[in-house]
């Protein structure tokens, strides 16, 4: 079945089943591998993308639900000019990543949080972070606060 997805400003016509999880369409059909598979049950957050500006766990969203909506992945978060999003820049400045596996989901969740709450509290940040097996939560928190000061 034909499904049309608008990802990072580009339209993709795909011949896939409508119940395919968006995660696999992004990774396997479109080739955007920045969004990671972690758990497959929308619990860990590694697969977080924005759908019409809202953070969503792409492993549990059927492509039929995402069709016709604006989807942004980690690859599309930076500006068209290549300038990093303030959250991405803060991630680098605070030396957040270790293994990096959860990072795209963490960054996407943080960008959505800052859009909704420009000056988040520590409790706000704790409410949106993903599972990080490396335990970089203190650096993640610092990076989100840093990004907030640069008006993400």
Sequence positions of predicted segments:
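Signature of N-terminal electron-transfer/Fe-S-associated modules in redox systems
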Residues: 1-152
């Amino acid at each position: 079945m034909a499904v049309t997805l608008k990802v990072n400003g580009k339209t993709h016509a795909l011949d896939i089943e409508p119940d395919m999880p968006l995660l696999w369409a992004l990774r396997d059909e479109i080739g955007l591998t920045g969004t990671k598979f972690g758990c497959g049950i929308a619990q860990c957050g590694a697969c977080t993308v924005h759908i019409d500006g809202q953070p969503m766990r792409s492993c549990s969203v059927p492509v039929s639900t995402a069709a016709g909506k604006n989807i942004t992945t980690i690859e599309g978060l930076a500006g068209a000019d290549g300038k990093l999003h303030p959250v991405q820049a803060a991630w680098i400045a605070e030396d957040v990543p270790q293994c990096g596996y959860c990072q795209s989901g963490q960054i996407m969740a943080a960008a959505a949080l800052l859009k909704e709450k420009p000056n988040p509290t520590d409790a706000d940040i704790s409410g949106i972070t993903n599972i990080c097996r490396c335990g970089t939560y203190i650096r993640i928190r610092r990076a989100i606060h840093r990004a907030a000061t640069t008006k993400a």
